[in-house]
Swiss-Prot record:
Gene for this chain: rpl35
HAMAP family linked: Ribosomal_uL29
Compartment(s) where it occurs, according to its Swiss-Prot or TrEMBL record: Cytoplasm
Protein name: Large ribosomal subunit protein uL29
Family: Belongs to the universal ribosomal protein uL29 family.
GO molecular function per UniProt: mRNA binding; structural constituent of ribosome
Length: 123
């Protein structure tokens, strides 16, 4: 089997990708048997290509799966941890803008009654 390109895999359905993955795994096992029994050098060099192809197929499967999950959870209140934006621990624990601006009743009354003083600087 020739080297597989990821862009060709992206157009395929999941069933086709899984079938191709099985075919590649069978081919890899045959190549490994050939390696043990002393196969040709061309077969030995093909092991690497097949391994990389398996990795490509798995990568495309996982990426499409994650993309579908992102679409499903778009606009929902709660998302799985791996779909949330990756930030530092400190940033995740920071107060939101709304939480920062919240005031107690006493503070609201005080700010309403005593507004901020404005001073004019004489030049």
């Amino acid at each position: 089997m020739a080297k597989i390109k990821a862009r060709d895999l992206r157009g395929k359905k999941k069933e086709e990708l899984l079938k191709q993955l099985d075919d590649l795994k069978v081919e890899l096992s045959q190549l490994r048997v050939a390696k043990v029994t002393g196969g040709a050098a061309s077969k030995l060099s093909k092991i690497r290509v097949v391994r990389k192809s398996i990795a490509r197929v798995l990568t495309v499967i996982n990426q499409t799966q994650k993309e579908n999950l992102r679409k499903f959870y778009k606009g929902k209140k709660y998302k799985p941890l791996d779909l949330r934006p990756k930030k530092t621990r400190a940033i995740r624990r920071q107060l939101t803008k709304h939480e920062e601006n919240l005031m107690t009743k006493k503070m609201q009354r005080k700010s309403r009654l005593y507004s901020i003083r404005k001073f004019a600087v004489k030049a």
